[in-house]
């Protein structure tokens, strides 16, 4: 079993929130014990919202999720159109009026946890990933430039070298448009520019 609510205590000496679950897992300071497996369809950790005694709240899912960008992010409202704006608008109602020093420390901790996540472990987790991309998941109007490989992933059977795919940075994925589409957006292609990509 996995908890659906627990307590966090702020340790002023280490400037960290310590999770305490006296009911289900009976653990202190073991945040990785709270996340149910992805195979459990009736209990998933899409959102972890922490509430403080002053009525403020914040999203701390990154603190507890093992694969936030690869798995959890796809189950959240932010992946829908304007879902990110909606969630920010909702959470703004619970925002603390005056930020404390520990809020900045917590922001840095959550950003560090997200950065430490590393590469996804399977091909499907690269689809829609905010930091990494595979060429097979690009849309017809997207192109990778420059083609700087971040690593490789094996797709298919182990040991087969023809199934090795390069991993690229999501920041190197660019949207391309036809001359007509650029014209409709109020822009014009300069005569000296070369065509980078053809769509057939």
Model-assigned labels for residue ranges:
Residues 1-5, 10-200:
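Long, composition-driven mixed-charge/polar low-complexity segments
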């Amino acid at each position: 079993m996995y908890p659906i609510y627990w307590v966090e205590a702020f340790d002023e000496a280490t400037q960290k929130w310590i999770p305490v679950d006296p009911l289900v897992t009976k653990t202190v300071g073991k945040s990785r014990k709270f996340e149910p497996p992805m195979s459990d369809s009736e209990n998933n950790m899409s959102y972890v919202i922490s509430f403080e005694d002053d009525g403020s709240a914040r999203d701390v899912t990154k603190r507890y999720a093992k694969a936030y960008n690869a798995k959890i992010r796809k189950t959240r409202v932010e992946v829908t159109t304007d879902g990110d704006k909606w969630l920010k608008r909702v959470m703004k109602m619970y925002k603390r009026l005056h930020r404390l020093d520990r809020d900045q420390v917590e922001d840095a901790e959550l950003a560090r946890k997200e950065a430490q996540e590393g590469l996804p472990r399977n091909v499907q987790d690269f689809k829609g990933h905010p930091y990494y991309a595979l060429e097979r998941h690009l849309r017809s109007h997207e192109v990778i430039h420059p083609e700087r490989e971040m690593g490789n992933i094996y797709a298919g059977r182990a040991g087969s070298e023809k199934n090795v795919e390069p991993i690229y940075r999501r920041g190197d994925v660019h949207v391309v448009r036809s001359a007509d589409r650029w014209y409709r957006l109020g822009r014009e292609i300069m005569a000296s520019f070369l065509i980078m990509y053809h769509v057939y």
